[in-house]
Amino acid sequence: MLNEFIAIRRELHQIPETGYKELKTQAYLLDYISKLPSEHLEVKKWRTGILVLVKGNNPEKTIGYRTDIDALPITEETGLPFASKHPGNMHACGHDLHMSIALGVLTHFASKPAKDNLLFVFQPAEEGPGGAKPIMESAEFAEWRPDSIYGLHIAPEYKVGEIAIKPGLLFANTSELFISFKGKGGHAAYPHLANDMVVAASAFVGQMQTIISRNIDPMDSAVITIGRIHGGEIQNVIAETAYLDGTIRTLSPETMQIVWTRLKQLAKGWEEAYQCEVEFHPGSDYYQVDNDPVETEEFIHFLEEQYPESYVPARSAMTGEDFGYFLSEIKGFMFWLGVDSEYSLHHAKLSPKEEAIPFAIDVLIHFLESK
């Protein structure tokens, strides 16, 4: 028989929605939650997200568990019979698995409450513009604010049954980068009468990499990636505007500040050198995921005792996750859950092995019961 929560994952996989547009997803989750035993449950909506409090039998604290619920603007290429029914959107980062795991854990505790309160946070907009910080600042979250909080993320590179975690920094600080260049367009035959923004933007791409090689401590780490460049509209017209879209990733907030300071200093020089206007446009900023050492070591000990073949020491990664905002104020941790897929996160053919779902549910139930 197909595991109930694998079936739920497949249903959620078909209705992927991007940040703050998760209306069908929210409705699906609310419908499922409404059918659970309600004696110990309280439910609140927050925008397109949901908070569910499971009242404990003799509570002295509140333990939080967070799952993200949004998808990516990617056209799915898996060929699965339960592929996305929303053209251009896909659960290409595993949030469908995250949700089904959270529902599995919630289902257990709705019928068998723990000693302490449990808060389940179904958070929208992790992929952007970032839902963690605003939901943390909400009155709904403040009323049930947990004393600790946990989360997971699927990892295609690990096998099913493996859990990778480490104390301290797990995910990097990330910042979206949107830059526009405005100069003077003109005829391709008369470049001396124009200010070519394709040239200006192209040169800026190369020069910004010297920030990494010459302004960042070699023992530290940072990366600037430009994933999209656009300039001009036709081949025989000098471009009046050009645009660069990318990301910055660093292992500390201080290094992120250095990168931003140098980028803005470079931009001022570019305006003089290329006779143009350079403007930075706001994007999402995600704080590093910094696992609490005591909480993490406790979880590692739990794994070694209860699931001795599962624990894998993790390495810090340059990936970003807005769960870091929770951990900046509340003790807890995030871990990687192995799903053994040949395709990476954010790939149109990502197809995680679903056996990871019942495994993760079992681990989390036993861990939370041990708290």
UniProtKB/Swiss-Prot annotation:
Its EC number is 3.5.1.47. The active site is at residues 68, 127. One of its GO terms (biological process) is diaminopimelate biosynthetic process. Pathway: Amino-acid biosynthesis; L-lysine biosynthesis via DAP pathway; LL-2,6-diaminopimelate from (S)-tetrahydrodipicolinate (acetylase route): step 3/3. GO terms for molecular function: N-acetyldiaminopimelate deacetylase activity. The keyword Cytoplasm does not apply. CDD domains: M20_Acy1_YkuR-like. It comes from the Bacteria. Keywords: Amino-acid biosynthesis, Diaminopimelate biosynthesis, Hydrolase, Lysine biosynthesis. Belongs to the peptidase M20A family. N-acetyldiaminopimelate deacetylase subfamily. HAMAP family: DapEL. This is N-acetyldiaminopimelate deacetylase. It comes from Listeria monocytogenes serotype 4a (strain HCC23). The lineage of its organism: Bacteria, Bacillati, Bacillota, Bacilli, Bacillales.
